Structure formats: structure tokens, C-alpha cells
């Protein structure tokens, strides 16, 4: 197989250049006449991932998982999902914040971003949102509870992609950051990175 010439080639080769499920590569012409059942929001952080992974690792991986989930939902259940562009604003722990270009986002800022997204989707008739979280510092439970008061008929669910399976069943030395798990998943989605 020839070597990839860029991210677009990787997306095409792996089937991720799907304008019907991925808003990052879609256009109004592809989505305007389709009805979407669920919006999927990848959420990560901007932070160093050791010396070998990109700063946006959490976003890249949660986006890849979200696209896979959207494609599976369509194929297996006939559910139309749209994957939103990933949010790169995460909550950071002290000790991490001092590292160059590590961006910390306060709870209030994250809540404001989520509120604006929910409010936009609500006006457009979408009533279901799944957050695919890729960063351990992010917590959405309180935000979701607060939003349910203002939007009682809007369902929001959140899942950390890295907790769905027991990593110890698949990896010899799992850790929790820039480890064997994140490195392997990055190699799956974007070997060129």
C-alpha cells in the first residue's frame, strides 16, 4: 500500500471522509435535506502528550471514535448521526498547566460552550447529543444536569471512549496519559502523526 501523502489521504483510505456523518468535512449541500437523529460532540483538550503525540491527541482520538460510532449507528440501526467538530478546550490539573501551550479551560467556560451548542441544536430541531470525551480532566455530569432544567426534552449523554473496554485485557502496560493505549489508538486512526 502506498504511503499516505497527507491527512486527507488517510481519511479517504480509512473511510472517514464521509460528508454525511462528519461536519468537519461536510458542507451545507450535503446536510440541508437530511434529518439527523443525534449529534455527536467529540471533546478533548489542548495539552502535551509526552514527546511523541500531538497536543490535540484527545480531540483527534475522540473524533475518530465518534466517526466510527456514527457510521456504525447508520449501518446497524439506521440512525443518522452528525459528528460535530471537536472541542479542544479541556480542564487541566495543576502541574500540567505550566507546560508550554497547555490550555486550561474553567468549568464555567466549558459549560458556556456546551450551553451554546445545545441551544443551537435545539433551535434546529435536534434533541439528542452524545459527548465523546477524550480527556480525563473533563466532567460533564453537573453541566448536563443543569441543562436538563432549561431543555427538559433534550437528551444529553456523555461517555469516555477509553473506559468502554477494560484496557488491561488488551494492553500490557496501560497508563492514563500518552500511554500505550492512546499511542495505539492514534496509530490506528492516524499513523502519519
Give names to the regions the model predicted:
Residues 58-71:
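Short catalytic helix/loop segments, enriched in acidic residues and glycine
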Residues 33-43, 79-91:
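Short coil-to-beta-strand
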Residues 72-79, 148-154:
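Short helix-capping segments at alpha-helix termini
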Residues 13-54:
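Active-site and ligand/interface coordination hotspots across diverse enzymes
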Residues 19, 89-181:
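Active-site histidine-anchored catalytic micro-motif
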Residues 1-14:
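Single conserved hydrophobic/aromatic residue that forms the stacking wall/gate
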Residues 176-184, 188-193:
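Domain-level recognition of soluble alpha/beta enzyme cores
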Amino acid at each position: 500500500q502506498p504511503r499516505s501523502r497527507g491527512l486527507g489521504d488517510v481519511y479517504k483510505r480509512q473511510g472517514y471522509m464521509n460528508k454525511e456523518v462528519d461536519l468537519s468535512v461536510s458542507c451545507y449541500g450535503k446536510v440541508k435535506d437530511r434529518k439527523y437523529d443525534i449529534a455527536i460532540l467529540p471533546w478533548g483538550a489542548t495539552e502535551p502528550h509526552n514527546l511523541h503525540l500531538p497536543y490535540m491527541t484527545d480531540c483527534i482520538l475522540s473524533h475518530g471514535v465518534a466517526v466510527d460510532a456514527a457510521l456504525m449507528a447508520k449501518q446497524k440501526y439506521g440512525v443518522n448521526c452528525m459528528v460535530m467538530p471537536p472541542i479542544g478546550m479541556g480542564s487541566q490539573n495543576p502541574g500540567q498547566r505550566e507546560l508550554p501551550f497547555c490550555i486550561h479551560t474553567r468549568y464555567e467556560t466549558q459549560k458556556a460552550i456546551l450551553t451554546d451548542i445545545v441551544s443551537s441544536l435545539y433551535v434546529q430541531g435536534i434533541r439528542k447529543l452524545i459527548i465523546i470525551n477524550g480527556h480525563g480532566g473533563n466532567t460533564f455530569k453537573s453541566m448536563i444536569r443543569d441543562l436538563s432544567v432549561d431543555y427538559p426534552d433534550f437528551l444529553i449523554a456523555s461517555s469516555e471512549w477509553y473506559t468502554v473496554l477494560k484496557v488491561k485485557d488488551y494492553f500490557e502496560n496501560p497508563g492514563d496519559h500518552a500511554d500505550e493505549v492512546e499511542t495505539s489508538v492514534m496509530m490506528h486512526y492516524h499513523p502519519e502523526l
